[in-house]
Amino acid sequence: MPLPKELFVDTSFWFAAMVATDVNHECAGELLEEAAVGASRFHTTRVVTSETLSLLRYRDGARSALLFARDIVPTVEMAVADLTDHAAALEVFRLLAPRRRLSYCDALSFVIVRQRLGDMACLAFDRDFRALGLTVLA
């Protein structure tokens, strides 16, 4: 089954794609190839981009983070979160964080995917995305 034409991408996927030692690296690479063949467009947020750059920098080094910034970030559609999105994400975080390991970044991604991107399918290795009821393909 081919990938959808539009996909939301989470930090967990970006990290796996960039870091050869990540347990999900091979799967991420296969999905990236499939997305290229099908001309899928990637969407993310600036918060996911920030989280990814920081994670790459601290866990894999500056080179990896700089490659991501140079080669990947310019090719991705940025879903820009406004104050209403941030307020909704904060409410999701307040409701779920006490009983679930949930980051604010994932709460904001949930709001963006559901309210801005029409419940778009996601590329993520983060279990939180499935737990939130999002459609996860990776």
Label the model's feature ranges:
Residues 9, 43-44, 80, 104, ...:
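Short beta-strand scaffold positions
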